[in-house]
Each structure stands twice: as C-alpha cells, then as structure tokens.
C-alpha cells in the first residue's frame, strides 16, 4: 500500500472498509423491535445481487426461503429443495448481507427426523454460510426440536398457520382458522425458545390476538396488518412471478413486463443491425 494512502486513503478504500465492518442486526435486537413498536420488514432472497439490494434498501430481515424451490427451481411446491441446495443459496446471501438478520429455511424433512438430525442440519446451515438463524415450520408438535436447536445455540424462527411443506396433508393452500390450535402452536413455539413466529394465511383477528399474547415478534404473511412485521417473497413483490399470485401479495413493481420489454428490444435491435452502435464499438 502506498505510504500516502495511510494518511489520506482513497474514497473507495474507506467505503470497502466501512461496508465490511458494519454490524448485522442481531437476534436480541430483532426481538427488541416488538417492545419498541418498530415494524419489522422481511423479504426472501436467493442470490448475492438480490440480497445486496434488499440489505441496502434497509429491510431488517432476509429469509433464504424454501420458496426457492418454486420461484427459482420451477417446482410446483417447496418440497423438492434439498439441504445442500438451501445451503448453496444461503452462502451467496450470507456473503452479500452486511446489516440485516439472515434466516434460512430448514427444508423438508430436515426438522422431522429427530432432534439430533435437526441439529446436524441446522448446524451445517450456520457453519457453511454467514447466516444467523433457521426457520422451521411447526408449533406445538415441533417444540422438542425447537428446544433442542436453541439449546445447541441455534436461533429458531417458528412458522405456524399455513405450512406449505404440509400442502399434501392440507389438500392445498388454505386459510387456517382454528384459533385454539393456532394460539397453542404460537405459545408452544415461544415457550420452546423460538425468537419469532411467522403467521401465514390466518384471519387478521387471530393474528392480532396471537401478537398480543406472545412476547416474541410475529411476522405476518397473509395475516393482517397487526403483526409485528411482514414478509413477502421478493419475486412476488417485484412482479417477476408468473401464474397464480396469492391474494396477500402486493406487487410494488412489474419487472416481468420490464424484463420482457428489454429483451424484446435487444432482440429487435440485433436483428435490425442497430446494436451494437458506434458507442458500443471499439475503434
């Protein structure tokens, strides 16, 4: 390094140092947002550039979701994605994020094979990525697994209500309305040590009651406005997803149309001989 840089480092050098030393949001700080009544924003990400953009935009949490099975791999549901594949995507996301809390889904059936196997799977996720926590689907029936993971030092976000990994048992993606069971699942997850609970596709009134009952943050997806935070699949939010989009999704952009238009324009210009033009050509 030139000696002059030690006294007057270039701007790019300062920026690289600062970006590499920013502290990530921690699990305790994430939990404190409920007490502070600070609404939590979360989105999914599956690759480096998307995760980097979401992090720079200031979301508090990023989930490497098993929805990668649907929106990236093209499967009909979340079941096919494997642990190795989740880790592959989580490693990219973990490398990109400097500020947000990064959570990784435990893919089916990694949390249904006993506590020891669950710890092995979740341990791999944390060891092989720069991510900080795992999410698993389940409430009361997963309490032992949640407690085992937490006891091993692995932060757990629980997921109750509609559980996409149980799509075949449920007979489809249906709103879950059993208030007693939903409340029991959320409280059991909290008691087992979960630091937050995702509430998916449940009536807003039930989500509100759960949010007021448990002390850890609730993250809603199709669960009304009174949850402590909200999460969406980023492909849905950006309007990239094709076909059916759930009712609870709001499209904040229409990138599917934008991308299609850009590619069509490129194709036409190549065929017409107008690309590359002089400004894209070396002399």
Task: Identify the residue ranges that each predicted region occupies.
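N-terminal mitochondrial targeting presequences
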Residues: 16-19
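Alpha/beta enzyme core
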Residues: 25-33, 40-75, 79, 83-104, ...
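C-terminal helix-cap and adjacent tail motif
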Residues: 247, 251-253
């Amino acid at each position: 390094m030139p000696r002059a840089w030690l006294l007057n480092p270039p701007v790019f050098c300062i920026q690289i140092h600062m970006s590499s030393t920013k502290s990530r949001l921690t699990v305790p700080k994430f939990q404190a947002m409920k007490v502070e009544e600070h609404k939590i924003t979360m989105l999914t990400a599956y690759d480096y550039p998307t995760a980097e953009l979401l992090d720079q935009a200031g979301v508090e949490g990023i989930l490497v979701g098993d929805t990668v099975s649907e929106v990236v791999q093209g499967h009909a549901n979340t079941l096919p994605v494997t642990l190795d594949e989740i880790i592959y995507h989580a490693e990219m996301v973990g490398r990109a994020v400097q500020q947000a809390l990064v959570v990784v889904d435990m893919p089916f059936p990694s949390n249904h094979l006993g506590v020891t196997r669950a710890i092995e799977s979740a341990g791999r996720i944390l060891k092989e990525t720069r991510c900080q926590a795992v999410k698993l689907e389940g409430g009361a029936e997963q309490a032992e697994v949640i407690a085992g993971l937490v006891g091993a030092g692995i932060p757990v976000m629980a997921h109750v209500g509609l559980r996409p990994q149980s799509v075949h048992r449920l007979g489809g993606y249906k709103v879950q309305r059993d208030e007693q069971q939903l409340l029991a699942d959320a409280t059991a997850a909290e008691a087992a040590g979960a630091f937050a609970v995702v509430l998916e596709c449940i009536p807003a009134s039930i989500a509100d009651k759960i949010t007021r009952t448990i002390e850890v943050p609730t993250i809603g997806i199709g669960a009304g406005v009174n949850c402590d935070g909200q999460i969406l699949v980023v492909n849905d939010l950006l309007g990239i997803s094709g076909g059916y989009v759930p009712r609870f999704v709001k499209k904040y952009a229409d990138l599917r149309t934008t991308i299609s238009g850009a590619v069509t324009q490129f194709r036409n210009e190549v065929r017409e001989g107008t690309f590359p033009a002089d400004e894209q050509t070396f002399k």
